[in-house]
Regions:
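A short beta-loop-alpha structural element at the N-terminal edge
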Residues: 6-20
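Conserved beta-strand in the GNAT
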Residues: 57, 63-72
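A short helix-loop-beta-strand connector motif used in the catalytic cores of GNAT acetyltransferases and
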Residues: 46-57, 84
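Conserved active-site alpha-helix within GNAT-family acetyltransferase domains
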Residues: 101, 125-144, 150
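Conserved GNAT acetyl-CoA-binding A-motif
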Residues: 112-122
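A short, internal acetyl-CoA/4′-phosphopantetheine-binding micro-motif in the GNAT/acyltransferase core
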Residues: 88-95
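Conserved acetyl-CoA-binding loop-helix of GNAT-fold acetyltransferases
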Residues: 96-109, 136
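Conserved GNAT-fold acetyl-CoA-binding loop/helix
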Residues: 19, 23-45
Length: 169
């Protein structure tokens, strides 16, 4: 292994590697039972007619060593675009080569070319290794914020309520 890290935009041919990376993150957290996405979901929503996300892959000696899945975001406070990192994963054998940092550095540079000024992400509260990594490269915890989410039945209840016609007085 030469250790040379090459970063490039993911293609549909990387869908399986991206899915594998997501599964590896879930496995680290003991939550593989919660993953319901499929490789076909990655192909459809990442590389279809209206992609919902983009991805970068890192390669070492031609092998996928890591991946970063992200999508566009907008800050109404800052009045500028940025990106939200959904997943960042580096295969264990390629850790300590700077792969994760290189992926995020490339993402920051790409984001800046698009007029973006920030990267946001969330980290599982139990994943202290990832928290330390992000701190070391300058992506710091935003202490004043908490993440809220609506999934499954809660999401369906919101969507069902939104299906009702709006009445104006």
């Amino acid at each position: 292994m030469t250790g040379t890290v090459a970063i490039r935009t993911a293609t549909i041919g990387n869908a399986e590697a991206l899915h594998r990376a997501m599964l590896a993150i879930a496995e680290t957290m003991g939550e593989t039972h919660r993953v319901v996405s499929t490789i076909d979901d990655i192909r459809r929503y990442g590389f279809g007619d209206a992609p919902c996300f983009e991805a970068l892959v890192a390669e070492v000696d031609g092998a996928v060593a890591g991946a970063c899945v992200f999508f566009a975001s907008f800050s109404t406070y800052r009045g500028r675009p940025g990106v939200y990192v959904q997943d960042l994963h580096v295969e264990p054998r390629y850790r300590r080569l700077g792969v994760g940092a290189k992926l995020l550095q490339r993402l920051a540079a790409l984001t800046r070319t698009r007029g973006g000024i920030y990267i946001r992400l969330s980290v599982d509260a139990r994943n202290t290794a990832a928290q330390g990594f992000y701190d070391r490269i300058g992506i710091v915890h935003s202490a004043g914020e908490l993440i809220h989410a609506a999934y499954d039945e809660a999401f369906d209840a919101l969507a069902d309520a939104g299906d009702e016609p709006t009445v104006t007085a």
